[in-house]
Amino acid sequence: MRKLKFIFLNIFIFSILPIQAEIPIVAYFGIPLEYSNVNRFKEFKEAGFDVSICFYDDTPVDTLLRILDDAQKSNIRLIISSGWVSVQPHVGIPRLKNHPALYGYFLQDEPWPKDISETKRRYQAMAKQDTKKPTYVNLLPNYGDGMPREIKMPPYKQYLQQTSAIGLPFISFDFYPIMKSGIRNTWYSCLEDIRQESLRTNKPFWAFALCTPHCDYPQPTIESLRLQIYSNLAYGAQAIEYFTYWTPKPTDEWDFHDAPISINGHRTRNYKLVKQMNQELRDLLPLFDKAEVLTVNHMVKIPEGTTKLQRIPTNIKKLKITGRQGAIISTFKKYGHLYMAIVNKDYLSDMELNISAKKNVTMITKQLKETTAKSKYKIGGGDILIFKLK
């Protein structure tokens, strides 16, 4: 009888969540035109990606349709950047929009404040041709890299409100926090602003992780990827984007190298790394898909623009963090249950957690199994620990 009860419990745990989440794992700068074929899309899928943002310039629409056919064979969907989409949407979009492998259309990356009105005009022209599939615009981070000095960046909240007026279906922004000198000190304040704008507009947000080293950005590790991705999820991100999958051509300003796939089409050491991260992430995503994030607080080190945890969550009696950078404490609802996610903000060292909770509190593994909560945990660099509170 005990065995039967145990089997029933496991079945129940797995049945409360969907088998596959709708949170996509996206690659910015996916497979280039000359490599866009069935085998490359299969390789892309094996790395754990769902959506490729592809830049095809003025490639004929017939060729784009062939590429979409190839992507469909590996269950990959594309966000397409092409002049036939963004410059002549009345020509390209009607022919592309019904293809099942088309996720959406790329319009612009990091629009400057002075460009927002023109971006809105172009967005409306594209959306007029397809009211169902999204048009993608990715926003600047709050540090505004790449903007000429003569162009003044407004307060970030104001910039977000200006871009929201475009009418985009979701908020996508990039922020690459981990540098050779340490973590950018405005990262979490940027996430706070993005989350608040998402709540204000009732639009989901997409967030990035950097896996392509260049300039002052170091070689990624599993710990640095975890920190970026799990911080994004703790704040409520509904898509995880990677910059990049394919190595972009280096420039005098940006010395890109060692993306998961090299500029010549060979796998680098980061292909295996990203694949490992995505395999881990895939199991967790159903829990965060469309979850309602209630609170996001910080413990130990309180970054600029964030809130210190003042009151421990429901059904938790004691919560103590021992670690250099401290933790994010996020509470969220999913299917009527209350959860708490704890993220170690230090990707270079472990963090200790001492916790006392009521008997009904359980720990959720990364495979979404409920286990008995313990009183002590060691959370690896950048890693996440999740509890079901009620």
Spans of features found by a protein language model:
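Bacterial N-terminal signal peptides
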Residues: 7-15
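Glycan-processing catalytic domains of CAZymes
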Residues: 20-357, 369-390
